[in-house]
Amino acid sequence: MRMDERKADELRPISIEINYLHHPEGSVLISIGNTKVICTASLEDRVPPFLRGQGKGWITAEYSMLPRATEQRNMRESTRGKVSGRTMEIQRLIGRALRSIIDLDKIGERTVWIDCDVIQADGGTRTTSITGAFVALSLAMEKALANGAIQEWPIDDFLAAVSVGIDPKLGAILDLCYAEDAQAEVDMNVVMTGKGEYVELQGTGEEATFSHNQLLTILALADKGIKQLIEEQRNALGAIANRVDEAKQKKKEQSEA
């Protein structure tokens, strides 16, 4: 039995509260277990220099943690005057992941800024950020469509992420909390689309190796968990989720034509 009495293939309790903040085009408070992240999506009517004049948009992300999101206070990176390598890695991961499920030509020369602020951390902050950021992005695109900023729905699949690992006593487990992550022999972050395709795999052995069969086992756990997370996204988005399904079907028909 796991520390919190979950089954090996069981996610922590999930809550997705949409429109959590007043000002952003899209905002979400997502809670997975004791990990809580505020995710926002903001539109800016310009793009990075390398995209100017091409008629397409861009998605980029920033990620941070409140000083007391963790058990011991961490100094703000703005106070240090330097963004850590970990933060840079996570920001790039979030941006890459979201760009995989959107047609950037359909948003015009605009940048969508994704901000993920961890207000409480208990493992899985990057995967929770990606899962929440997708919902915030969808809300922002719905608002942009409604006010005429964009003419066509751009998101063509769902996107979510989860952690999996191998515990020395329990074997393969899904959605690790911080304490489980600290003692895991193997841990992996998996980002997948609604079609079940991989966007990113980040896996390492912690003073241990893992076999091909173990890899298949934890990937199967991730697949199960991400399907459940996408259902939670659907529930949170309501009718907006239908737009994603319609765009996915249209893209499929175009690829088969």
From Swiss-Prot:
Keywords: Nucleotidyltransferase, RNA-binding, rRNA processing, Transferase, tRNA processing, tRNA-binding
Pfam families found in the cross-reference section: RNase_PH, RNase_PH_C
InterPro entries for this protein: ExoRNase_PH_dom1 (IPR001247), ExoRNase_PH_dom2 (IPR015847), ExoRNase_PH_dom2_sf (IPR036345), PNPase/RNase_PH_dom_sf (IPR027408), Ribosomal_Su5_D2-typ_SF (IPR020568), RNase_PH (IPR050080), RNase_PH_bac-type (IPR002381), RNase_PH_CS (IPR018336)
Reaction equation(s) it catalyzes: tRNA(n+1) + phosphate = tRNA(n) + a ribonucleoside 5'-diphosphate
EC numbers on record: 2.7.7.56
GO annotation, biological process: rRNA catabolic process; rRNA processing; tRNA processing
Domain of life: Bacteria
Annotated residues for binding of phosphate: R86, G124, T125, R126
MF annotations from Gene Ontology: 3'-5'-RNA exonuclease activity; tRNA binding; tRNA nucleotidyltransferase activity
HAMAP family attached to this UniProt entry: RNase_PH (MF_00564)
Protein family according to the UniProt entry: Belongs to the RNase PH family.
Subunit structure of this chain's protein: Homohexameric ring arranged as a trimer of dimers.
Physiological role: Phosphorolytic 3'-5' exoribonuclease that plays an important role in tRNA 3'-end maturation. Removes nucleotide residues following the 3'-CCA terminus of tRNAs; can also add nucleotides to the ends of RNA molecules by using nucleoside diphosphates as substrates, but this may not be physiologically important. Probably plays a role in initiation of 16S rRNA degradation (leading to ribosome degradation) during starvation.
The protein's name in its UniProt record: Ribonuclease PH
UniProt source species: Halalkalibacterium halodurans (strain ATCC BAA-125 / DSM 18197 / FERM 7344 / JCM 9153 / C-125)
